[in-house]
A protein has these predicted regions:
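Anion-binding alpha/beta catalytic cores of soluble intermediary-metabolism enzymes, centered on
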Residues: 1-120, 125-129, 134-174
Length: 174
């Protein structure tokens, strides 16, 4: 673990509208990660967070709703990943899911929606998105609407691999 051959795009995002750095994935490599790939991505997210000095990363599995919805794959997989995290199967991490983006990022929203007992809601270090589309929209929104600064890389390679967006600023590309 992780299995060989799984590459994933991991970004570190700094936004004035959030109280700390966020590590997010996958913005550009895996269009629709399957469950095993999500396990690997969690490993990459936690590894990146640890490189930033976070001992026990808090990871939010993003879905359309914070309720477990049996017909929504990101919802059921988020719940399963959270249970695996509780049992230590994903390493020294705290995983919660499913969490809608607003619940994940804002404690007040979590309280308003009566999401109780979450160590992640309102304070995640990492966001695991269900697919490339949602992650990419967040990535671009963070840079353009929140004036965020981003550093991005491909994890799972044998040598360091930085991957920038064509629309990134010169500063971000450096």
């Amino acid at each position: 673990f992780p299995p060989k051959g799984v590459l994933s795009h991991v970004s570190v995002v700094e936004m004035p509208c959030y109280h700390k750095l966020l590590v997010i994935s996958d913005v550009a490599v895996i269009p629709l990660p399957d469950f095993k790939q999500k396990m690997v991505i969690i490993n990459y997210l936690s590894k990146t967070a640890r490189m930033l000095g976070i001992k026990t990363p808090k990871i939010a599995c993003i879905a359309p709703s914070e309720q477990v919805l049996p017909n929504v794959i990101s919802s059921t997989e988020g719940a399963l990943l959270a249970k695996m995290g509780d049992r230590g199967q994903l390493g020294d991490v705290i995983v919660d899911g499913p969490l809608s983006l607003d619940v994940a990022l804002y404690k007040e929203v979590a309280e308003h929606k009566k999401v109780r007992g979450s160590a992640v809601a309102g304070d995640p270090d990492c966001l695991l998105f269900p697919n490339l589309e949602s992650a990419n929209v967040f990535f671009k929104s963070a840079t353009h609407f929140c004036n965020g600064e981003i550093a991005a890389m491909v994890m799972g390679t044998k040598v360091p691999c930085v991957l920038t967006s064509r629309g990134d600023t010169s500063r971000t590309k450096l």
